Curated annotation (Swiss-Prot):
Catalytic activity: L-glutamyl-tRNA(Gln) + L-glutamine + ATP + H2O = L-glutaminyl-tRNA(Gln) + L-glutamate + ADP + phosphate + H(+)
Annotated S-S bridges: none
Species assigned in the record: Culex quinquefasciatus (Southern house mosquito)
Location of the region described as Disordered in the Swiss-Prot/TrEMBL record: 51-73
A GO-annotated cellular component: mitochondrion
Family note: Belongs to the GatC family.
Lineage: Eukaryota, Metazoa, Ecdysozoa, Arthropoda, Hexapoda
Purpose: Allows the formation of correctly charged Gln-tRNA(Gln) through the transamidation of misacylated Glu-tRNA(Gln) in the mitochondria. The reaction takes place in the presence of glutamine and ATP through an activated gamma-phospho-Glu-tRNA(Gln).
Protein name per UniProt: Glutamyl-tRNA(Gln) amidotransferase subunit C-4, mitochondrial
Subcellular location: Mitochondrion
Length: 172
């Protein structure tokens, strides 16, 4: 990755030609990012034309801490069922803890009141998005698509052979 020093970054109104010219006139030491801290310019984020869309303060949770459910244990039989359905290995104690944490988090989300909240079309609903125009075609690209598959059978994709089989012996 090439890091461009701040003083060489393109500013509004600066052409590519002038940027290349100033880039070519710099010393290799300037491009390595080994400048002293005293010569670096500090960025004032409040003066940027497009400041970050990431909130500066965390969102206060509406989840009541007292109404959160206790830890929901996952027994061995449910663990095996989830392993088989999700094709994820849950052998370790850490995997079981992660699964229980995920279930606890999901149950907290269920307690959030969303009655008067209007659904979003997208997270960036207020942003102007340029979408491509839909073009209807008859397709006929089946062979092109199937070339991407590692294994095919009768003009269909085949799931990876490393998957966990559906029938399993119960663990001891």
């Amino acid at each position: 990755m090439i890091r461009i020093p701040f003083h060489l970054r393109q500013t509004p109104g600066r052409t590519l030609h002038s940027l290349v010219r100033s880039f070519a006139s710099t010393k290799p030491a300037d491009l390595s990012g080994t400048q002293e801290k005293s010569t670096r310019q500090k960025i004032n984020f409040h003066e940027l034309k497009h400041p970050s869309k990431v909130p500066q303060r965390p969102h206060k949770s509406t989840i009541d801490g007292q109404s959160t459910p206790t830890r929901i244990p996952v027994d061995a039989q449910k663990g095996q069922l989830l392993e088989r359905l999700s094709l994820v290995d849950l052998d370790s104690a850490e995997a079981h803890r992660t699964l229980e944490d995920a279930i606890e988090f999901a149950s907290q989300i269920l307690s959030v009141d969303t009655d008067d909240v209007e659904p979003l079309y997208t997270v960036l609903e207020r942003e102007r998005l340029t979408l491509r125009e839909d073009r209807v075609s008859d397709g006929n690209i089946q062979q092109d698509v199937l070339r991407n598959a590692r294994v095919t059978e009768e003009e269909n994709f085949v799931a990876p052979p490393e998957n966990i089989p559906l029938e399993q012996e119960p663990r001891k």
